[in-house]
Structure formats: C-alpha cells, structure tokens
Design a protein with these regions (language model features):
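Basic, Lys/Arg-enriched alpha-helical interface segments
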Residues: 1-71, 80-86, 92-135
C-alpha cells in the first residue's frame, strides 16, 4: 500500500496589530465544557477537511457548535499553500440559523487586515488550549 504524505492543516488565530487575539479571548472565556465542544468541532475540520464546515461566502467558512440553548460559531478562512492553515477570524454566540452579516463583514475585514500586514507568514507550531481543552 502506498503511503501518502498528507499535510494536516493547523489552526491559527487572527491577531491585531497590538497582539490581541479576539477569537482566543472569546474561547478562553467559555465554560470548560463549551470550550471542549468547540475544540472537538475544530479538530473535526482539521482532520476531515472543509466539507465538515459550512461555506459562507468567498474564503469564509463557519464552524457550528451546539451548546446549551444557543450555539457557538467560529468563522475562519483557509490560508497558505493547499490550505495548510485554518485562520480563526471571529467567534461568537448566537441563537439564529443565519450568520449575522456584521460578523461576516468583520471576518472579511480581519482577513484583509491579516493578509495586508503579511501576518500569514509561518510561525512556530504550538499547542492551542482553550480553558483546559487542547486542540
């Protein structure tokens, strides 16, 4: 059997010019059980590809995570050669089915900012943890 060299994508988080990471801050503030559910959903996308996510528009995709009476959403964009980076741009809680336009617009704005600053350059690999749940 031939062995294939499949590169598994890794998650990165949008950071502002000041180094703030709004997605990480949102996810760190979640209760541990909810953070664990988000990590499981993000792992599924990393392992199974974009078909495990919902396409929104352009380069944007959505991770949907059902928690308690609402849902957590993480908007992200694949980046790099062969989409080897999944860039988390926006995370929020919601109750409606459709992603609010303001969050999609914010994700697109952050993606333009990220690419405009050249922030997509490779970084050292690290373990990502949210409130005790490891991605």
């Amino acid at each position: 059997m031939a062995r294939t060299n499949t590169i598994r994508p890794r998650w990165r988080h949008y950071t502002t010019n000041r180094g703030d990471s709004p997605v990480r801050e949102f996810l760190d503030a979640l209760p541990a059980d909810d953070a664990a559910k988000v990590v499981v959903a993000m792992r599924q996308i990393r392992e199974n590809g974009l078909q495990a996510a919902r396409h929104l528009r352009g380069d944007l995709y959505e991770v949907r995570v059902p928690v308690s009476d609402q849902g957590i959403r993480v908007l992200f964009a694949p980046q790099g050669k062969r989409s080897t980076v999944l860039l988390a741009l926006v995370a929020y809680s919601k109750k409606s089915q459709q992603a609010p336009a303001r969050f999609i617009d914010l994700a697109e704005s952050r993606l333009r900012d990220w690419n405009g600053r050249g922030a997509a350059r490779p970084q050292r690999r690290s373990v990502t943890t949210y409130n005790g749940a490891t991605l």
